[in-house]
From Swiss-Prot:
Name of the protein in question: Rapamycin-insensitive companion of mTOR
PTM annotation (Phosphothreonine): residues: T1103, T1135, T1271, T1295, T1332, T1376, T1695
Pfam (any one): RICTOR_V
Location relative to the cell: Cell membrane; Endoplasmic reticulum membrane; Lysosome membrane
Record lineage: Eukaryota, Metazoa, Chordata, Craniata, Vertebrata
Length: 1708
């Protein structure tokens, strides 16, 4: 009703407005023949004189009435549509804006289909529509109607949309704000609408630039989002992506942040610059955030190369505080994090983002406890995927990959305090988020914070920076403590509920616990008396001065109560407290809620009631006194008028509301319940339920009582749920969610029943809330069983009710219940037919609500609501899917198999049709269905049989419709819900999160399935020296060394490999993939259960059959044996389990050596080792490092060795290896560490040099992970003309004590050095060989990438980048030894360095000793959260380059124009296209009027005769308002002279007749301050034009040339067109305008020329003019009569009515 009433009132207003404007009431007789009515209307509209404008207005309004009455039919109307349009368009030329508005309205009603629209456009009415939009003279009514007509044209057929109107809209969009045009937003909205329907015409005219410009102009998030989403929609699909310039247009929104000199408008005054900059920041922030909320935006801003995300993060490293502050706000918004207050105090900032901080919505008058609990208590879903997590994980991974963490460290250490504080909190939030939602391959390097640790520990950097870093680490520790503590309830009511729920569970668990207070000290009584005295209660009556801490202690004292202690002092103590708390005393009750000790006083009050309860009979009298007083207060409150009771009792503002907590405390105890019954408290509360306007009292009642026991408390709750007001019923329903989340005892027995009752509430909001709570409750199987037992009716609740019912199918009991009723078969059919598609809408709507300003329409309202209010970290839990529920058990799986559903879904995925949106939606529906099926092990087997998972992975990486990639990411997350799913994805280089939500601090499970005895293989770290070890936080007490061994195996395909040491000389062409994390294999690397076995086998192998000496000058290095060249072997690494070397001085190896074991070592150095068969022993000293380590330079004494051990493992593994891995974020120099994540070094087998350590030194801060797959034929790299180097495993253990490294701007990659002092090491030449190997790998990965692109990881400290020159054949070191040493000296000793994963196969998911959890002890039955990402996140950001679209595709009615303006031109705004450019080119070639008139007589004649010139270069019959009608009507108008369109009209008029001039007397030039007739100097306005700088008048001697001659008109036309085209340039605009005004003044009849106006309109439709210029041009022609067009209309109406013929061509 409201909507109807509103519509009627608006209509009345509209009518009244027209009457106010003077419209004459023209009667319309609908009983007459429609053709007669129409003829009368058209005659009145077309008549030039004799009909007042207001009468015309009446007739035009009658025209719309007539159309609405009889419909669209040429037969009924008696006129062709062309005839009607020829007459109606005259209304658009009327001088009265009301008539023009009515004409536009009439056209809008007339255009019903494409055929009519084609006719309107053929008659060039679009020129006149554009004219209405351009002109602004208090004519908003007219312009509004014009825009409504434009929208109708888009709706009818956007592909026909004319460029003339597009240019007009774009001009308003570009310049409207400066011109204070009120239609600017409407025009931009229409441009967006058009861009979606016909992107080509918008892109061709530069409309996309207009949209993006307005993004930076608009600070309203709803509008800003709509604008940017238009561009993102075009980027989403390959067919429309061509219209957006790659890497240029979308990146415009970043400009305010990335361009420090950005000025949005050159006209901004200096004084307004700061304000303008703030506005641009805000608008840009909104645009960036909206872009990151869409898949098209994410993929385009994150794609590898020079991406937008790199620009943003790079700017963080530049010390501009204003930009940093703004960017931090952007990042907080992108990750949906609350923004801390601006402060220099970290604690203050931290408290401002504490989830438990007070919020206004938690007040009693608002959402109270229900709102607080929804924020603080976690959702019951433990493993149901939250799609927001998937989205955030992807974004976070992309940002981390591009160096965000290092950027934040730079901001923390180099910014003002308030910025540093914000950056620290953001860093903490992101690390916490990464720990929770990132797969381990994406997060293993996050927790080290090496750069920050380095800065805090190093004395080589400025003190201020070091102190900042140290402070930041302390702050992060406090932040972690806050996260670990979790959100604490703010209100005592919620705290009371949670504590009671915990207490009941604990009591149940510890029912038979032994009393702890058996051994009470003898002096308890004495101590009690001392405390009584010190509490001050007995000393004085200043209640608030009492020691309330001591009072609480006394009341909680074990075994102290009035029953045990008869002491009078204790009774006095109790009486004083009782008096204080009684409502009648008005002491406690009248204190304000925000009083400093308010919470403490209430807590003590609750303890006091418990104390009295425990005192039994002795305390009963006091307790009864208190309770009766509270009842009296309650009755008094409820008896008053509501406003008085609240005002007088101060329920909203005073502690009186906490009396309900006292009642709640009593309701938790059986004795307390009896007391409440005895004092009629329950009866009083029941009476409250039926009273009106007692909402606050009822809220307090519901929130305070304990419902764990069956009794009157539940009766009261039940009554409030059914009998109270709507607001109270809704609150009570919401409170059931609080009880559910607080895990109140036996909720499934009684809570579910109450919720089912609420489903039938007449208020839809309440039933919907109950349904939502039931959905959450069913996450718990006990609740689901209880619900199925009740068999509720859910069909009346729409789609949500249906989805809840589908949950029944997930357990056999529910399946059989529904199957018996034939429900399952019906649903299968429905889902196949329509619900699979509906499911896509449901999910995308939820995601839109969570991510954008979109709000779901309420109660069937079609109006799309938007909200500027920012949602706090919303959740989008995956809706229930029929197939996903069926696959939870074997019966359901069998049913899906029998129905052949999966095969069809797989077919849709394998052969998608991406050209139609319906097909794209069908593909999404199939993906979601398959994902839900794959979310259980049963269903996953079905997907495996179809082998469809690789197809989904392919779509995720390569699909050209970018939103499909997003859907695939979500769907692959569903497949990763089970361990089996994770393992399958792992084989395809996708890593998944392997924990559920109940693990708040997830520990990485051990993936090593083959590990027989996990505990025995937990390695530990080698102690470097006492100083470094003691400085390590939480270091292991017992440190033992470990060793790394290379395992070679001639049997291909027998086990997984991790090849670090590669023979570079072998011929092979492995395939490389850039990875952001180690690649995980299905089966991990085999450890040996017994460390003794390993020790023996390794020691048995220490013979040296193939030693090869190499001097430091040997250019080729130690060549490997010919055997190693010819045989294809697989090299694997193994981390030896911990072996304690400290118990013996040395090892004595067993002398027998197995034949299959080889040791291949190449030595370099000046120490000679005999090439004998003896096996050197490894002594303890060989592995110990002295404290003077690093003082001598023995770089030549390095050695390389290869220990070769045979190992047999499982035979079904893929062959994978890691050739080069620099992917620790830590500075990787570590002690000889061996951890689950660590490959350790090859043992140095020399016995002579006791200071020799291991040769493994690779340092890096961020990751370039490279893995390659070995083919069975070969496993070595080929590298011509290169050293044969046995390479070191990057990041493996090290031997240097280190200081922290101070980094330069983190955006610059710095080397961490490969040199060290007196332990065996790679030479610098080896380092270059190593680097070259890396470069070649990168080139094979991305042949098209430049050196910097290929090598520069987003890391800030990448190994081997700019500091080493990367040239294939000429290695030049830019590092001096001293710089090597300096770099090494900085390295940090962060604990996590030792725990950073290296080995891809075995140790992917490992962290540290504390992370070692066997999969056996891990919660196996619990599903994971359902989140997976590719190991290399860039895999899903690759987009095929589509060239920018060509401008040759012009709408059909512009063919002639397209031919005319075919070339190129300069100086135009982008987006105008070739048409625009060439018109300049041609028009500049014309001779100016001055040149023609200055030429001699014969030249002028020749010029005119040779060109057959009309003065109009682009004129055709099709693009002229006048000539097109002649062509259509097929007759000539009466006034031939009016149209000088063809040369024949004046061809026979001799030149001398009007220019009586001899050859010897040329035209005289009369100087004036203007040049030419126009008064415009072409020398100034157009570079290169050949015009006179003098002024001319058309004179013969002193006689003016007659201006009514054809020749004169030609010249004037040329001059007008030349000046008009010059106006499209912003140079000398004023000069050109002056020239046109001069012509207007001297030759006004020049502009009364329809063909000239059509030509000008044609130029306006094909060239870009600024809005002021368009307005100026339109106003030149504004007072023109256009008589010939009236004559055409009269000719139409003069012809007798003829039978209309349907135009079939137009229809086609």
């Amino acid at each position: 009703m409201a909507a109807i009433g509103r519509g009627r009132s608006l209509k009345n207003l509209r009518v009244r407005g027209r009457n106010d404007s003077g419209e004459e009431n023209v009667p319309l007789d609908l009983t007459r023949e429609p053709s007669d009515n129409l003829r009368e209307i058209l005659q009145n509209v077309a008549r030039l004189q004799g009909v007042s404008n207001m009468r015309k207005l009446g007739h035009l309004n009658n025209f719309t009435k007539l159309l609405c009455d009889i419909g669209h039919s040429e037969e009924k109307l008696g006129f062709h549509y062309e005839d009607i349009i020829i007459c109606l368009r005259l209304a658009l030329l009327n001088e009265a804006k009301e008539v023009r508005a009515a004409g536009l309205r009439a056209l809008r009603y007339l255009i019903q289909d494409s055929s009519i629209l084609q006719k309107v456009l053929k008659l060039k009415v679009d020129y006149l529509i554009a004219r209405c939009i351009d002109i602004q003279q208090s004519n908003e009514v007219e312009r509004t109607q014009a825009l409504r007509l434009v929208r109708k044209m888009i709706t009818v057929n956007a592909s026909l949309f004319p460029s003339s109107v597009t240019n007009s809209l774009i001009a308003v969009g570009n310049d409207g704000l400066q011109e204070r045009d009120r239609m600017v937003r409407a025009c931009i909205a229409i441009i967006c609408e058009l861009a979606l329907q016909n992107p080509e015409v918008v892109a061709l005219r530069g409309g996309l630039n207009t949209i993006l410009k307005n993004v930076i102009d608009c600070q309203l998030s709803r509008i800003n989002e709509a604008l940017i989403t238009t561009i993102l929609h075009l980027l989403n699909h390959p067919k429309t992506r061509q219209y957006v310039r790659a890497d240029v247009e979308l990146e415009r929104i970043l400009a305010p942040y990335t361009d420090f000199h950005y000025r949005h408008s050159p006209d901004t005054a200096e004084g307004q610059l700061k304000e303008d900059r703030e506005a641009r920041f805000l608008a840009s922030k909104m645009g960036i955030i909206a872009t990151f909320r869409s898949w098209a935006g994410i993929i385009n801003l994150c794609k590898p190369g020079n991406s937008g995300i790199q620009s943003l993060i790079g700017v963080l490293c530049i010390p501009n505080m204003e930009i940093r502050r703004g960017l931090l706000e952007v990042l907080y918004d992108i990750f949906r994090l609350p923004l801390p207050v601006v402060t220099e105090e970290f604690i203050e900032a931290l408290l401002s983002v504490d989830p438990g901080r007070f919020q206004d919505s938690w007040r009693l008058s608002d959402g109270f406890v229900a709102a607080e609990a929804k924020t603080i208590l976690p959702h019951r879903a433990r493993s149901r995927p939250d799609l927001m997590d998937n989205y955030l994980a992807l974004i976070l991974s992309a940002f981390i990959r591009n160096g965000l963490l290092e950027g934040l460290v730079e901001v923390i250490t180099n910014s003002d305090d308030h910025i540093s504080v914000r950056a620290t909190i953001l860093l903490g939030e992101l690390l916490h988020m990464a720990n929770t939602i990132l797969p381990h391959s994406h997060s293993h390097h996050l927790h080290c914070l090496p750069t920050l640790m380095n800065m805090a520990a190093s004395f080589d950097i400025p003190k201020e920076k070091r102190l900042r870093a140290s402070a930041a680490l302390n702050c992060l520790k406090r932040f972690h403590e806050m996260k670990k503590r979790g959100p604490k309830p703010y209100s005592l009511h919620l705290d009371h509920i949670i504590q009671k729920a915990i207490a009941t569970h604990q009591k149940r668990d510890q029912y038979l616990r032994v009393q702890k207070d058996i051994f009470i000290l003898k002096d308890t009584e004495e101590a009690l008396l001392i405390n009584l005295r010190d509490s001050q209660v007995l000393q004085h009556k200043e209640n608030l001065e009492w020691n309330w801490n001591l009072i609480g202690t006394i009341l909680k004292w074990p075994n102290v109560n009035l029953r045990n202690y008869k002491d009078e002092q204790l009774h006095r103590f109790v009486r004083r407290l009782l008096y204080f708390y009684k409502p009648s005393s008005k002491l406690y009750a009248n204190l304000d809620l925000d009083f400093a000790k308010a919470k403490q006083l209430t807590v003590v009050g609750c303890q006091f009631t418990e104390f009295l309860l425990e005192s039994e009979e002795d305390g009963q009298g006091y307790l009864e006194d208190l309770v009766k007083d509270i009842v009296q207060w309650l009755n008094a409150s409820s008896g008053m008028k509501p406003e008085r009771s609240l005002q007088n009792n101060g329920l909203l503002t005073t502690l009186s509301q906490h009396y309900f907590l006292f009642i709640g405390t009593l309701s938790c105890h059986p004795h307390g319940v009896k007391m409440l019954e005895k004092c009629s408290v329950f009866q009083c509360l029941l009476n409250l339920c039926s009273l009106k306007n007692q909402d606050h009292l009822l809220k307090l009642t519901v929130s305070s009582l304990d419902y764990s026991r069956d009794g009157l408390a539940r009766v009261i709750l039940s009554k409030i749920l059914t009998a109270a007001t709507d607001a109270c019923r809704l609150y009570a329903t919401k409170h059931l969610r609080v009880l559910l989340r607080a895990n109140v005892e036996f909720f499934n027995n009684w809570g579910i029943e109450l919720l089912v009752t609420q489903l039938h509430d007449k208020n839809k909001t309440i039933s919907s809330e109950a349904l939502d709570i039931l959905d959450e409750a069913c996450e718990d199987k006990a609740n689901l069983h209880a619900l199925i037992q009740m068999k509720p009716a859910l069909s009346h609740l729409g789609d949500k009710g249906l989805l809840l019912l589908l949950r029944f199918l997930s357990i056999p009991k529910g399946f059989s219940y529904l199957n018996e009723r034939g429900y399952v078969a019906k649903q299968l059919e429905k889902w196949h037919r329509e619900y699979n598609s509906k499911y896509v809408d449901l999910i995308e709507e939820q995601l839109n609500e969570a991510l954008t300003t979109y709000r779901k329409p309420v109660d069937g309202d079609n109006y799309v609501r938007r909200s500027n209010q920012r949602l706090q970290r919303p959740h989008v839990y995956l809706p229930i899917h029929l197939y996903g529920q069926l696959v939870h058990h074997k019966t359901g799986c069998h049913l899906l198999e029998v129905q052949n559903i999966i095969t069809e879904l797989c077919r849709n995925v394998r052969t998608p049709d991406l050209d139609k949106w319906e097909e794209i939606k069908k593909l999404k529906a199939s993906l979601w269905a398959l994902g839900n099926i794959g979310s259980s092990n049963w269903g996953l087997n079905l997907l495996q049989e179809e082998n469809v998972i690789p197809d989904i992975l392919k779509l995720a990486k390569q699909c050209e419709v970018l939103s499909i990639r997003g859907t695939c990411v979500y769907v692959l997350g569903l497949i990763a819900k089970t361990k089996q799913g994770c393992d399958i994805l792992k084989c395809h280089n996708w890593d998944a999160v392997r924990h559920s939500r109940k693990h708040l601090w997830p520990v990485v499970p051990d993936d090593v399935e083959q590990l027989c005895n996990e505990l025995s293989s937990i390695p530990s770290t080698l102690s470097l020296n006492s100083e470094s070890t003691s400085s390590r936080h939480n270091s292991e007490s017992e440190s033992v060394p470990s060793s790394m061994f290379i395992l070679e195996d001639d049997r291909f395909g027998s086990s997984s490999t991790s090849t670090f040491f590669l023979d570079i000389n072998e011929d092979t062409e492995p395939t490389f993939y850039d990875r952001s994390g180690p690649i995980k294999d299905k089966n991990s690397f085999p450890f040996f259960a017994s460390s003794k076995l390993v020790k023996n086998r390794i020691l048995n192998s220490l013979t040296l059959p193939n030693k090869k000496h190499r001097s430091s000058s040997d250019p080729k290095g130690g060549k490997l044996s010919s055997e190693s060249k010819t045989s294809n072997r697989r090299i694997r690494t193994l981390t030896e389990p911990s072996v304690d070397f400290n118990h013996s001085d040395d090892f004595t190896p067993i002398s027998t050596v197995q034949k299959t074991l080889q040791l291949e070592t190449s030595f370099m150095g000046n120490k000679h080792i005999e090439d004998t068969g003896s096996t050197p022993s490894i002594g303890e000293n060989d592995l110990k490092f002295t404290k003077n380590f690093g003082t001598e330079n023995h770089r030549e004494n390095t050695s390389r060795e290869r220990l070769v051990v045979e190992s047999s493992t499982s035979s079904h593994m893929k062959i994978r290896s890691q050739s080069f891995n620099t992917d620790t974020t830590t500075s990787g120099i570590s002690s000889m560490s061996s951890s689950p994540s660590r490959e350790t070094v090859g043992v140095d087998a020399t016995t002579m040099d006791t200071d020799c350590g291991s040769m493994s030194t690779v340092v890096s801060t961020k990751t370039i992970k490279t893995s390659h797959y070995l083919t069975p034929q070969s496993n070595h790299l080929s590298l011509s003309k290169s050293n044969s180097v046995s390479l070191v495993p990057p990041g493996s253990s090290h031997t240097l004590p280190r200081r922290a490294q101070s980094l330069k701007a983190p955006s610059i990659a710095t080397i961490k050095s490969l040199a060290d002092c007196n332990f065996s090491y790679t030479s610098s030449r080896d380092a270059f060989g190593y680097a070259t190997l890396k470069r070649l790998q990168q080139q094979r990965m991305h042949p098209s990438l430049s050196h910097s692109e290929a090598l520069a990881s987003p890391a800030k400290d990448v190994l081997f980048t700019d500091t080493i020159t990367m040239k294939a054949n000429s290695f030049e070191s830019r590092l001096t030894p001293s710089r090597f040493m300096k770099a090494l000296s900085y390295a940090s000793l962060d604990k996590e360095d030792l725990l950073s994963p290296i080995n891809q196969n075995t140790l992917q998911r490992s962290s540290s000793v504390r992370s070692m959890v066997s999969s056996a002890t891990y919660g196996g039955s619990d599903d994971y959260i359902g989140l997976a990402l590719p190991v290399d996140i860039n895999d899903i950001f690759q987009v095929k380059d589509i060239p920018y679209f060509q401008t040759k595709n012009i709408p059909p009615h512009d063919d002639r124009g397209a031919r005319a303006f075919a070339h190129d031109a300069g100086g135009l705004p982008s987006g105008t296209g070739g048409l625009v450019k060439n018109s300049f080119h041609l028009l500049r070639q014309q001779m100016s009027l001055t040149e023609i008139m200055n030429s001699i007589h014969s030249d002028a004649s020749l010029f005119l005769e040779s060109t057959e010139d009309t003065g109009l270069q682009e004129h055709t019959d099709d693009n002229c308002l006048y000539c097109v009608c002649i062509e259509i009507l097929g007759f000539q108008p009466s006034n031939q002279l009016s149209a000088i369109c063809s040369h024949s009209d004046f061809q026979d008029i001799p030149y001398s007749d009007w220019c009586e001039q001899t050859i010897h007397n040329p035209l005289e030039v009369v100087p004036s301050k203007f040049s030419g007739i126009s008064g415009c100097s072409d020398g100034v306005s157009q570079e290169g034009s050949a015009s006179s700088t003098k002024s001319t008048e058309l004179l013969l001697g002193v006689k003016t040339i007659p201006d009514d001659t054809p020749m004169c008109r030609i010249l004037l036309r040329k001059e007008v067109l030349r000046l008009v085209i010059n106006l499209s340039s912003s140079v000398s605009t004023k000069c050109h305008e002056t020239g046109l005004l001069t012509i207007k003044e001297k030759y006004p009849q020049t502009f009364d020329d329809i063909c000239l106006y059509s030509e000008v309109s044609h130029l306006l439709s094909h060239c870009t003019f600024r809005l002021p210029c368009r307005r100026f041009i339109q106003e030149l022609f504004q007072d023109v009569q256009f008589l010939q067009m009236h004559e055409e209309a009269e000719a139409v109406l003069a012809t007798p009515p003829k039978q209309p013929i349907v135009d079939t061509s137009a229809e086609s």
